[in-house]
């Protein structure tokens, strides 16, 4: 990046390819296109300066251009070192949008690019964050705490924290007071995924959340669609592109049976694998059993599994002791947000052979090997291209509505985590029905009164479980 070049992409010449795919994606993203139609004239995001940290894919490019069509200024980075689609990043950079994203970033590059989404040419701060996983939010909040004199940078717990803390110190030295000023300018954050939402709720519980947040993940039209149906298509896609393995007849273990785990188990079962599930939650375990999956412990299943996938959002789900028990050439991957579900750090002293980008063969001292996908990071985005456009349209329409809500009605919200109201959730679903040829039945006034709703909805209570 030069002084006159406010972007970092792999190859700007890929922009034409990216634009062609972006044009196709728009036809599969009716929610975002409807948002442009509904809000384009009123420009509700005029004045918004959005720092976006979310996988820089073709689908995200459509989101970015939707935010801009509604009046926002945007700076963008990917929220994962492997998830960028370089042609998508090039297409966005070619329009003059500052984007900092390359497939296969180092951790140093990743945190430098995260810093760059807050560095506006006029020196003024961002006033909105659009986040996926919480890294952009945590970057600002940890930095502000360090500026306040808290000892938060002296004891990194991982290689990633070492790099993060170094980047914070670098910015503090270059721009004293930057983090505090930036934190105080934020009107709100919209958070895409389970992991990031958990971080926000922890901050709220500790009284450390300095601005309102909208939990996009728990919109029904996100968690029950993106997390389930998206994973149902993209997990097997990532494993196939990474390994070309025949999945029919193989034993696959899915660790976790939340929404992502449910979609992942169905994905593997649909490919013909014999699927087993591990769970800590008795309700989810019972669901898995009654959906026809054998519920096991990883300790018991380790030696017979051909494919093992983590979906939990927790740490140390697959330990080095588990991996020592795995079969020769077992495929190991993760579709949760961070790389700590698998103890990848414990493998670093073993023999690694890079087969191709995001596919590594790791050999144990006894000669046994495992295939690790995307170094334990999101394999559906590292080894493939993530979820299809249609399901991401629902998720990203929620993001757009959340950004509008927090930017235009900031004073209506306390420094807490909120979920979009039911009528907006139903609106997002409604916008996607025509594309699938689905037609809604309309309640009569009498029918609506009988169940205590209006013919236009909302049709379910806030606590209804879909």
From Swiss-Prot:
Pfam families: AdoHcyase, AdoHcyase_NAD. Pathway: Amino-acid biosynthesis; L-homocysteine biosynthesis; L-homocysteine from S-adenosyl-L-homocysteine: step 1/1. SUPFAM superfamilies: Formate/glycerate dehydrogenase catalytic domain-like, NAD(P)-binding Rossmann-fold domains. It is found in: Cytoplasm. Keywords: Cytoplasm, Hydrolase, NAD, One-carbon metabolism. NAD(+) binds at residues 193-195, 227, 256-261, 279, 314, 335-337, 380. GO terms for biological process: L-homocysteine biosynthetic process; one-carbon metabolic process; S-adenosylmethionine cycle. Binds 1 NAD(+) per subunit. It catalyses: S-adenosyl-L-homocysteine + H2O = L-homocysteine + adenosine. Its cofactor is NAD(+). One of its GO terms (molecular function) is adenosylhomocysteinase activity. Substrate binds at residues 57, 132, 192, 222, 226. SMART domains: AdoHcyase, AdoHcyase_NAD. GO terms for cellular component: cytosol. Its EC number is 3.13.2.1. Signal peptide: none annotated. NCBIfam families: ahcY, PRK05476.2-3. Belongs to the adenosylhomocysteinase family. May play a key role in the regulation of the intracellular concentration of adenosylhomocysteine. This is Adenosylhomocysteinase. It comes from Brucella anthropi (strain ATCC 49188 / DSM 6882 / CCUG 24695 / JCM 21032 / LMG 3331 / NBRC 15819 / NCTC 12168 / Alc 37) (Ochrobactrum anthropi). The lineage of its organism: Bacteria, Pseudomonadati, Pseudomonadota, Alphaproteobacteria, Hyphomicrobiales.
């Amino acid at each position: 990046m030069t002084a006159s070049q406010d972007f970092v992409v792999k190859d700007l010449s890929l922009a034409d390819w990216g634009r062609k795919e972006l044009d196709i994606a728009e036809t599969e993203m009716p929610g975002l296109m409807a948002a442009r139609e509904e809000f384009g004239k009123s420009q509700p995001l005029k004045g918004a300066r959005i720092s976006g940290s979310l996988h820089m894919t073709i689908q995200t490019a459509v989101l970015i251009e939707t935010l801009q069509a509604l009046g926002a200024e945007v700076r963008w980075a990917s929220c994962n070192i492997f998830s960028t689609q370089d042609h998508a990043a090039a297409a966005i950079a070619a329009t003059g949008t500052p984007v900092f994203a390359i497939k296969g970033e180092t951790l140093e590059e990743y945190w430098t690019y995260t810093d760059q989404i807050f560095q506006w040419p006029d020196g003024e701060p961002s006033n909105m964050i659009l986040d996926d996983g919480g890294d952009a939010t945590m970057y600002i909040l940890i930095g502000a705490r360090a500026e306040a004199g808290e000892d938060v940078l002296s004891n990194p717990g991982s290689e990633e924290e070492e790099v993060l803390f170094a980047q914070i110190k670098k910015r503090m030295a270059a721009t004293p007071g930057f983090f505090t000023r930036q934190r105080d300018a934020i009107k709100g954050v919209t958070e895409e995924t389970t992991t990031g939402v958990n971080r926000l709720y922890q901050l709220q519980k500790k009284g450390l959340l300095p601005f309102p947040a909208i939990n996009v993940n728990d919109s029904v039209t996100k968690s029950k669609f993106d997390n389930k149906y998206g994973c149902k298509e993209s997990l097997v896609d990532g494993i196939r592109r990474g390994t070309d393995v025949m999945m029919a007849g193989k034993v696959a273990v899915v660790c976790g049976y939340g929404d992502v785990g449910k979609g992942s188990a169905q994905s593997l079962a649909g490919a013909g694998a014999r699927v087993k599930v591990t769970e800590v939650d008795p309700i989810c375990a019972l669901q898995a059993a009654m959906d026809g999956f054998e519920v096991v412990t990883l300790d018991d299943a380790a030696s017979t599994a051909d494919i093992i996938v983590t979906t939990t959002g927790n740490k140390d789900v697959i330990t080095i002791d588990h991996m020592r028990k795995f079969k020769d050439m077992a495929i190991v991957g993760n579709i949760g947000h961070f790389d700590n579900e698998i103890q990848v750090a414990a493998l670093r002293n073993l023999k690694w052979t890079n087969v191709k980008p995001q596919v590594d063969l790791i050999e144990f001292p006894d000669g046994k090997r495992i295939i690790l996908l995307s170094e334990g990071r999101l394999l559906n985005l590292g080894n493939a291209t993530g979820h299809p456009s249609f399901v991401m349209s629902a998720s990203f329409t929620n993001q757009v509505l959340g950004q509008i809500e927090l930017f235009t009605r900031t004073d209506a919200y306390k420094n807490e985590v909120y979920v979009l109201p039911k009528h907006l959730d139903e609106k997002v679903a409604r916008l996607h029905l025509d594309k699938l040829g689905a037609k809604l039945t309309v309640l009569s006034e009498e029918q609506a009164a009988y169940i205590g709703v209006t013919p236009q909805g909302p049709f379910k209570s806030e606590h209804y479980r879909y």
